[in-house]
Amino acid sequence: LTSDGKTVLFAYTACGVSAGQASAEGRPSDPTWGVEMKERPPWTPETSYHVFRVSVDGTGLTQLTDGPWNDLHPNWLPDGRIVFISERRGGFGRCHGRPVPLFTLHAMDADGRNMVRLSHHEGNEWHPSADGNGMIVYSRWDYVDRGHNQAHHPWITAPDGRNPRAIHGNFKPSHDLNPDMELN
């Protein structure tokens, strides 16, 4: 939501059901689709998440991203640009046991132009937003000094992606020091 409360950003996909696959009630007409489904439906451009902008009154719906990449978690920056995460960088997460796409920080103008990658990190980054000083705050799956199953920790970076750093320092918490806090 913009600071003036007039415009919303969101990510949307058709969830693998094209118009030809839906019944009149909007439910999938293919009996293999649903809870019993053992495989992902085949990829199509319509099944990728894309970023949209719309006025709170429902007018002016505009798709801002396109292509074969998933674009998620859009949020406004104080300068009017949009920060989001995307698979556009390419690459795969390091230790998932199988190829899992990598999501990193990106930004673009409010009209979807001038898209830039903000991060070169080799792990997933999630939920970007802006703090009161205009810095981008996000969570990052980071393996430095902690196991693979630790919680994602908060990070901060400049709006142009410079100087990314952990907010609280990069340390592995000791469960002995705080037994009530379980991070696994």
Task: Name these PLM-found stretches.
Residues 56-70, 109-123, 158-177:
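Multi-bladed beta-propeller domains
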Residues 7-16, 53, 63, 81-87, ...:
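Residue position within the beta-strands of beta-propeller blades
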Residues 30, 41-58, 99-112, 151-162:
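Beta-propeller blade signature
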Residues 11-47, 84-101, 138-152:
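Short, conserved, GDST-rich strand-edge loop motifs in beta-rich repeat architectures
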